[in-house]
């Protein structure tokens, strides 16, 4: 294996694709059951009422309604307020 770079070669050019994390549905927005609300790594947001958490910490709606952000015991939470 050469330890000097040859002509027209480069040591750069490696990068990973973005993970597309973040809030997908914002406060007050209507969602249907199963819709992804937040994609995250770790529990930056915790699930509240009618919100489930996937194996990769994704938060999703368990029922149709509007998204509501709040805090509970110092943690940021996401809940669903059911439609009347």
Swiss-Prot record:
Ranges that cross the membrane: none
Domain of life: Bacteria
Any one of the GO BP annotations: translation
A GO CC term assigned to this protein in UniProt: cytosolic large ribosomal subunit
SUPFAM superfamilies on file: Ribosomal L27 protein-like (SSF110324)
Keyword field contains Zinc: no
UniProt KW Ribosomal protein keyword: yes
UniProt GO molecular function: structural constituent of ribosome
InterPro entries in UniProt: Ribosomal_bL27, Ribosomal_bL27_CS
Keywords: Ribonucleoprotein, Ribosomal protein
Family: Belongs to the bacterial ribosomal protein bL27 family.
HAMAP family for the chain: Ribosomal_bL27
Entry protein name: Large ribosomal subunit protein bL27
Organism (species): Salinispora tropica (strain ATCC BAA-916 / DSM 44818 / JCM 13857 / NBRC 105044 / CNB-440)
